[in-house]
Amino acid sequence: MSDKSELKAELERKKQRLAQIREEKKRKEEERKKKEAELKKDAVPLQDDSDLEKKRREADALLQSMGITSDVSAAPAPMSPTAKSVGSPSEAGSQDSGDGTTGPRTLHWDCDPSTVLLHSELGRGPLKLAMTKMTHVDFPPKEVVSYTKETQTPTMTEQKDEEDEEEETPAAQPEAETEKEKPEEKQVEEALPHELTEEEKLQILHSEEFMDFFDHSTRIVERALSEHVDVFFDYSGRDMEEKEGEMQAGTKLSLNRKFVDDRWSKQRVVTCLDWSPQYPELLVASYNNNEEAPHEPDGVALVWNMKYKKATPEYVFHCQSAVMSAAFAKFHPNLVVGGTYSGQIVLWDNRSNRRTPVQRTPLSAAAHTHPVYCVNVVGTQNAHNLISISTDGKMCSWSLDMLSQPQDSMELVFKQSKSVAVTSMSFPLGDVNNFVVGSEDGSVYTASRHGSRAGISEMFEGHHGPITGIHCHTAAGPVDFSHLFLTASFDWTVKLWSNKNNKPLYSFEDNSDYVYDVMWSPVHPALFACVDGLGRVDLWNLNNDTEVPTASVAVDGSPALNRLRWSQSGREIAVGDSEGQIHIYDVGEQIAVPRNDEWTRFVRTLVEINENRDDAEELAAQRLAA
């Protein structure tokens, strides 16, 4: 009970204390409000007093100037240190005007020095003054900036001071910089990566990400390092007189590049060439086996790049059998097709890190079991096939998506008895059904893939040795020459044919060795090229001459030239030899680029050739009769 009563008493005391605090606070608030009201009342007459006093001072000054003194004592007696003045702070403050003049009242000094009474002439009572401490505050004048077209320049003294300061500061900077660099060096030393172990290094080197990066980056670096620019080239043409001989030679045939790789192509025979339809600078070459390197793969296909001056192939592909033919998949820019000596068709993909084929055909009776010298992709973007023919006369049609079995196969047999040993094949321009083939027996055959007369239809005789190359006319123009084709043979000749006549139209007999390959220009109707076993490249323009080549060049070392291939533009020829080298020749503009009348001129040339052939046949018949 006693605890409860004490608690109640304590609460009562606290309540009383709170009530007292509230009352005192309320009383102080009322006093403050009263003082504010009084100050507001006094503020208005002060302004009037100040105006009145100002006028009075002016009057006194006027009287003094006239020699009349005022009643007010000019110099009051000094106040004693003990004198005290009582007054309102607000009134004391109001006496200080803005310009530092005295207040607006007349002062009357009392005889008693201890007190000073201020009597207001306006009828106010005496005010007590008190000593106050004044705080002096300086306000800088407002800066006025005027934006005019005048030139504002600082004084030279300020500039010199700033320059002196700038000259003095760098002297102290090196020490501070060295101090800052020390901790940074410590941080760099601490952030150094740890030393990799041999196992970790091997793991990184064999990772797929590193292989992709290394393969891609080395190609780019190699291209950059291989570029050569002629910094002395003169665009004004002043040096053309000196180069006149070179320019004349350039109008015919001039060596541009030579591709050879010590490991992959040296001591190998170039068996086939093909330019990429999508990337005109890429050239694929297939190679036979290297007898001096039995541990290397027998078959190699290299993709060379004409765009960059590097000496190594862009891609290296290989397989376990010698590659006898190769071609870019016409509608697949990443695929390369190869025909091998074992009879397999292989497919490489440059998107894969593998150098070995991503697909291959089986070695079975359903596919090829003899060397494949002919592969070609025919058709359109949405409907195309890979056509391959082996030396046993078997033709297969494949889908590039599935090489496990052919879509169609056919035995090329003449008159149901004689199997054709095909060595070369060519399709006319724009035709995917009819084609011509050359054989080991020296005969040429026309054939078709489909229809009532599928297979071999006609035989053309004229060569006295195996046919090494055959090519149909491909230059498109106002006149259709797709019925014409050329053949090259071991009998040292090149022959011109028409599928409308089973006898050759003309025989070009300027060579003195095996002629290994022949090909029409893709842009000029009357121009073709051929290569022989003595290392000679010949260009024939039938509109100019049919007896001797228009241009001819011999390769250094006179290696046997096995294959040639025109570029799509008709301005370059790629030639492969028996030593694994590929020579790129530039064809001069005067030869390579056809004029507008070349097609009509070639028609007249063919008419003359036919007339001469008929005359020769009549003459031969007369001699036989005699």
From Swiss-Prot:
Phenotypic consequence of gene deletion: Morphant embryos display defective craniofacial patterning, microcephaly, a marked disorganization of axonal patterning in the head, reduced number of axon tracts crossing the dorsal midline, and increased cell death.
Region (Disordered): 20-108, 142-197
Pfam families: Dynein_IC2, WD40
GO cellular component labels: cytoplasm; cytoplasmic dynein complex
Biased composition (Polar residues): 82-99
Sequence ranges of Acidic residues compositional bias: 160-169
Record keywords: Cytoplasm, Cytoskeleton, Repeat, WD repeat
SUPFAM superfamilies: WD40 repeat-like
Biological process, per Gene Ontology: microtubule-based movement
Gene3D superfamilies on file: YVTN repeat-like/Quinoprotein amine dehydrogenase (2.130.10.10)
Name of the protein in question: Dynein, cytoplasmic 1, intermediate chain 2a
Organism: Danio rerio
Encoding gene (name): dync1i2a
